Curated annotation (Swiss-Prot):
Record-linked InterPro entries: Fork_head_dom, FOX_domain-containing, TF_fork_head_CS_1, TF_fork_head_CS_2, WH-like_DNA-bd_sf, WH_DNA-bd_sf
Effect of F93L: In dyl; negative regulation of lens epithelial cell proliferation; positive regulation of lens fiber cell differentiation; positive regulation of epithelial cell apoptotic process; loss of sequence-specific DNA binding
Signals that turn on the gene: Head ectoderm expression is induced by RAX and lens expression is induced by PAX6.
Region (Disordered): 1-62, 163-189
PANTHER family from the UniProt entry: FORKHEAD BOX PROTEIN, FORKHEAD BOX PROTEIN E3
Keyword list, A-Z: Disease variant, DNA-binding, Nucleus, Transcription, Transcription regulation
Illness association: Defects in Foxe3 are the cause of the dysgenetic lens (dyl) phenotype. In mouse mutant dyl the lens vesicle fails to separate from the ectoderm, causing a fusion between the lens and the cornea. Lack of a proliferating anterior lens epithelium leads to absence of secondary lens fibers and a dysplastic, cataractous lens.
The protein's name in its UniProt record: Forkhead box protein E3
GO biological process: camera-type eye development; cell development; ciliary body morphogenesis; cornea development in camera-type eye; epithelial cell proliferation; eye development; iris morphogenesis; lens development in camera-type eye
GO cellular component, one term: transcription regulator complex
Amino acid sequence: MDAQVAFSGFPALPSLTPSGPQLPTLAGAEPGREPEEVVGGGDAEPTAVPGPGKRRRRPLQRGKPPYSYIALIAMALAHAPGRRLTLAAIYRFITERFAFYRDSPRKWQNSIRHNLTLNDCFVKVPREPGNPGKGNYWTLDPAAADMFDNGSFLRRRKRFKRAELPAPPPPPPPFPYAPFPPPPAPASAPPARLFRLDSLLGLQPEPPGPVAPEPPCCAAPDAAFPPCAAAASPPLYSPASERLGLPAPLPAQPLLALAGSAGALGPLGAGEAYLRQPGFAPGLERYL
């Protein structure tokens, strides 16, 4: 029997071409269209496409120096002739030394400026009046010279902080040794009045001495109250005398005249003679 007639009931097998095995058809490819060629060979990994709601990762920056901004500034100041540079000179040193900052955007310049103003290890030096130019100088604090380990700008020991100056002491109190204010000065004693009752009572007769010549109206020794004295001197007002019912005190001149003429008044003194005058009210002795 013919073999072609015996397998006529089975579907025909696909014919194999001598060119080699055919590539499998990719899912979603149109029939009759050849698949696109893969670029880079089979060793290349396909790029991960972020799904919806996911952020694409930023690529790593290649060629960036391993130094911090503080280390870059300190490196620029260390290579300066006078150990000080302006901000523009620091930018120029960094771009000339590292090509990464020369080709990258200028955002790093803001970081350099912020590190200069926020770190205590950098000190601003004003420009001299006779030195032309723009901008102030920046230098490294002498106390921060050992900020990096063994002069390596890759490792920093600790954050430098400038020591603050002590505050001035408060002023001393006005009386440091006296817990209480000093006592007020004693008030001066009021001046003694010319005539007081107690001074008249304690009046003692003075020893006889040279007596000035008396006026003619007071020459009579037997007159206790000369009329000329009463007429010459007006009576003085005394509230105490009025309250006690006493006559007004005599002026100074008649009293001195009475004290001088002790013989006319009797054996008693001038004070006793003054108390025994007939003008006193009865019962005055109990007030003395």
